[in-house]
Structure formats: structure tokens, C-alpha cells
Amino acid sequence: MNYDVVIIGAGPSGIAAGHNIINNKLSCCIIDKQVFPRNKICAGGVTQKTFELLKSLNLGQEFKGENTIVSKSVSIYLKDKYITDIECKGNTYLVDRFEFDEYLVRAYEKKGGKLLENTKIKNIDTENNIITLYDNQNIKFKYIIGADGAVGITRSLVDKDIKPNGFCLQVDVDKINTNYNSDKMSMYYGVLPYGYGWIFPKKNHLSVGFIGEYDKKIDYKC
């Protein structure tokens, strides 16, 4: 297989790049280790500016997620102490990544873009422009885009000595089991070193999580 561009990672950034490439009449293949639709640790806040950018990519049918709601403000907390509300510049769409990424991926495929799901990469040869998959299939490319995150295989092409020490945890909680009735986003600072926590409501559930620098002395499960 030969492509003008191969993209590693089919999240929003990789898929957006793929749409741009297809729109410019170039061949594109996106490789992802997961099968779509799939869940993703993410609060799911998409700004008005981002939605306008996505519309400019000519995605076809407009995204209408069943669990999406619109938020216009975020509440800021220092640990459990309320500090203030901040009004957003435009709407923030609180999306379910299970739905949102599936929409972006299938719109890309409808344009003729190639997607390899459930596919792992064994090696990337940047001298000969060849990607070797674990099934020993080779893919040739002119250009490669790394959109597979901080611990992805393309990161190692830049600096093999980087040792990521950040981590993230998230759980989706049914709204019916809570008294959280607001459409406001909530951000919590001071809950752990070098990080923050969040509660982002969706139509039927709350996305609750935190991200920070890992410290083995802290019992995060408590």
C-alpha cells in the first residue's frame, strides 16, 4: 500500500488532518490501535471555535450526539471551596467521545479516506518511508503525521529518552445517582499536585476525572 500521507492516531486531531488531506485530493491512511466506536478518557469539552473549524472541513451531516449538551460557563473550585464562575466565549459543546470520534471517523471514510482500525505498528522506517505492521504488512508514505499522543510510537521518533509521568483517571456516573442538575462545567484545582479535576455533565451522565503528575506516595483510589 502506498499513500501520500499516513497518520498515526484517529482522535480528533488525526481525523481533522485526514479530512484536510482528502479535501486537497491527496491519498491518506489513518492507523489506530483501537476499534471504533471506543471510549476515551476525556472531559469532552469542545469549543464553539473548534466546531466552526470542523464545519469548514465539509464533514457532511452535522454532528448530533445523543449525550451532547451545551454549556456556557465553568465553575472554579480550589479543592472543595467554590471560587467563581467564568462565562465562556461562545458555546462549549460537552460531547461523548464514544459518539463524537465515531462521527469524525465515519465522515472521513465516506470521503474515501483509508482507516486501519485494530492495527498495531511494529516499526517506522523514516529513511525509506515504510511503516511495518505487526502482521508484517508494509505501508509506504511520502509524509507521516504523529497524532497518537504522548506515549505513542511516533513520540519515540522525536526523543526515545522521554519518560512520561503523567496520568489520568475518569469515570462516567449516571446523573440519576447524583444531585448534579447544572449544565455548568466544574474545574477543581489543588486536589492533587501539578494537576486538576473536573466534572463535565452530559445529557445522561457526568464525566468525572482528574489528571496530573503521578506520585507513588498518593493513594488515588481513595
What spans do the regions from the language model cover?
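N-terminal Rossmann-fold NAD(P) dinucleotide-binding loop
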Residues: 14-15
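Predominantly flavin-linked oxidoreductase catalytic cores and closely associated redox partners
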Residues: 107-222
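Glycine-rich FAD pyrophosphate-binding loop
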Residues: 6, 10, 19-42
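A conserved beta-strand/loop capping segment in the N-terminal third of enzymes
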Residues: 47-103
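Extreme N-terminal starter segment of soluble prokaryotic enzymes
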Residues: 1-5
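Rossmann-fold NAD(P)-dependent oxidoreductase module
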Residues: 20, 103, 107
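Glycine-rich phosphate/pyrophosphate-binding beta-alpha loops
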Residues: 41-44, 91-94, 196
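Short, conserved loop/turn and helix-capping segments at secondary-structure boundaries
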Residues: 44-48, 163
